[in-house]
């Protein structure tokens, strides 16, 4: 998306910051970001992003626009020697976990599942072992640094010696302050997201469901 923005709007320089969904929304609130991407799962409602946007950008009208859906699941070692099959395996004391950093969508998903299953984080071997990307988690599992970790399906196809256990389809959205949508620059960004060229490029990457790409999911 960033590359397409710069190609379509040569006078605009797009800066990307990989800081996690939670921090991205906070920076949007703090006027340090123009657009935030988010995949934050609310364990109480099983909904993505909407409640977090309301809480982290209080009183600020925002528009939530879908970018894609993707599958989250467990990375496990090739052949799944520990027979890991689902969320209930988080209760097992014979497994070691590779976690993600605080503030990212994967960490919020894990912590929500622990609440849902009434599991204390202290019961998770490796809860404090953090990596900072899907790729790093998958690589750690492949190297035997842990038995499993959460990440997206697409990355599992890039790393040897791991298998992928699909668990949950997540909605990955863009969050824009509603008042900004009157700006021609933001209108052009929405045109890019809705264009066949952008969708074809995203589909070509594999692992993404584009059924709602460009659709307004909610207005807060």
PLM features per residue range, with description:
Residues 78-85, 179-185:
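Short helix-loop capping/hinge motifs at secondary-structure junctions, enriched
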Residues 58-71, 159-191, 193-216:
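Periplasmic-binding protein-like
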Residues 37-53, 138-168:
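A ligand-binding cleft/hinge motif common to bilobed small-molecule-binding domains
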Residues 3-80:
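N-terminal segment of the mature folded domain
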Residues 13-20, 100, 121-133:
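Short beta-strand-to-loop elements that line the ligand-binding cleft
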Residues 88-108:
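Short loop->beta-strand "edge-of-pocket" segments that line small-molecule binding or catalytic clefts
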Residues 28-29, 90, 110, 138-142:
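Hydrophobic residues within well-ordered alpha-helices
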